[in-house]
Every structure is written in structure tokens, then in C-alpha cells.
Amino acid sequence: TDLVDARLRGRMHGFDPLDDYVAWIKSNGDGNARITIDFDRIRRFFCDKQVVIDEFHGSGRGYLTRLVGEAGVRYTVLHAQRDPDLPGLDYANPEEPFIQPLKEKVAETGAHLGMGMDTDADRYGIVDKGGIFFRPNQILPMLVRYLGIERGLTGRVIATQTDRKSVV
């Protein structure tokens, strides 16, 4: 095929960004003014808790599990295999009713938190230990409030048109 030929001729090289991305996240973005991530605090908070991650067979698989694993957080993962046929999923979007397998696994394992992301990892959903599902439009205002009030951070918040009313 053309791809095989391009690789054989040295015109195309593949790479796995996972190691570099995880290192960048753990270094807090190399001083690019991101909010720092306190992995020790995450480790302490989750020391006796578990999380469930639903990767929806997508391209984001392995990233979040690697980060929480390196933070010392125990986790269970769903739909971790690369499979474009999306077996076991009616629709690969982390929203109700399609987040039901994540909600069930959180309840079954007694996990403290469930996190799901769609197949290209640009959408997410959160399930709390009581099985309540939170959309990004519910999570983002809570996060902005926490960062502004509890952490005393100031600055601008950039939001999409759909998020704007919930974070302003």
C-alpha cells in the first residue's frame, strides 16, 4: 500500500505522543502559565479510593489511565481496546443514556468517581460516587468558582458559545 511504501522509503515516520504528553502534563506545561497540578495531593486524596475511566475505544485511550496510574490512583478501565466498530456501545459519546456502563461500573466497584471521554477525547462526562452524571456545562462553572474563590486565581476564562452562560 501507499503507507507501507512511504514508510519503507523514509517519507513517513510514526510516533507515539503518550510519553511526551504525560511528561509535559506532569511538568505542569513547562511554565506556560497553566494551573499547576499537584499530583501528591491527588495521590493523598485518592489513597483509599478508586476511579473508573471509560475510554470508549477511542484515540484518547491510555492517556488518563497513565496519568492517574502514575499519580498512584487505583482505577478500572472500560472500553480500552482500539476498535473502530465500538463493540458494546450504542453511541460513543459520554452523555446519558450512553454513559450507563460507566455509571454501573462506578456502582459495582464502589468507585469515588467515573470519567468518560468520547472517541476523539474532546468531550467528557463525570459520574460521582452516587451515580449522578455531570455534563461539562455543569463541571466547568464549579471549576471556575473553585479556582476563583478557593484558590484566589484571577484572569480570563475562555468559553465556547454553549458554555458562555454557565461560566460568566
Which functions belong to the PLM regions below?
Residues 148-152:
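Conserved phosphate-handling catalytic cores of large alpha/beta enzymes
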